[in-house]
Swiss-Prot record:
The keyword Cytoplasm does not apply. GO terms for biological process: translation. Keywords: Ribonucleoprotein, Ribosomal protein, RNA-binding, rRNA-binding, tRNA-binding. GO terms for cellular component: cytosolic large ribosomal subunit. This is Large ribosomal subunit protein uL16. InterPro entries: Ribosomal_uL16, Ribosomal_uL16_bact-type, Ribosomal_uL16_CS, Ribosomal_uL16_dom, Ribosomal_uL16_sf. One of its GO terms (molecular function) is rRNA binding. The lineage of its organism: Bacteria, Bacillati, Mycoplasmatota, Mycoplasmoidales, Mycoplasmoidaceae. Binds 23S rRNA and is also seen to make contacts with the A and possibly P site tRNAs. Pfam families: Ribosomal_L16. Part of the 50S ribosomal subunit.
Length: 138
């Protein structure tokens, strides 16, 4: 599971995923990429399941880049606990993904195989996605 080795603060303020991405908007490393069409918090388990879905469909020659990382911890208070008495304990790690962010990239295999792998990865994610080609205007 992806999570940071160290963080300066254990419990950050919630970061909004509304609006469009400022960076990470084009395919830089691979030939095809998976772009988010809407914003969300993508947790480490969802990133991992998408990574597994891609790597199952890629041959050993294929290369994959994961362009997002879960830097932010989400907290949760235990069940049936009264309000107040501080913030809850960290429960999971999430990546803040805004609309237009390229999340995964693939190279070194045929175009049909790349599209199939990215489609399978998109099914594992809780947001609408689209497959983009390198150099394509977004």
């Amino acid at each position: 599971m992806l999570q940071p080795k160290r963080t300066k603060f254990r419990k950050p303020h919630k970061v909004s995923y509304e609006g469009k991405a400022k960076g990470n908007k084009q395919v830089d490393f691979g030939e095809f990429g998976l772009m988010a069409l809407e914003g969300a918090w993508i947790d480490a388990r969802q990133i991992e399941s998408a990574r597994i879905a891609i790597s199952k469909r890629l041959l050993k020659t294929g290369k994959m880049w994961i362009r997002i990382f879960p830097h932010m911890s989400l907290t949760k208070k235990p069940l049936e606990v009264r309000m107040g008495s501080g913030k809850g304990s960290p429960e999971k790690w999430v990546a803040v993904v805004k609309a237009g962010t390229v999340m995964f990239e693939i190279a070194n295999v045929s175009e049909e195989l790349m599209r199939e792998a990215l489609r399978a990865a998109g099914n594992k994610l809780p947001i609408k996605v689209k497959i983009v080609k390198k150099g394509e205007a977004n």
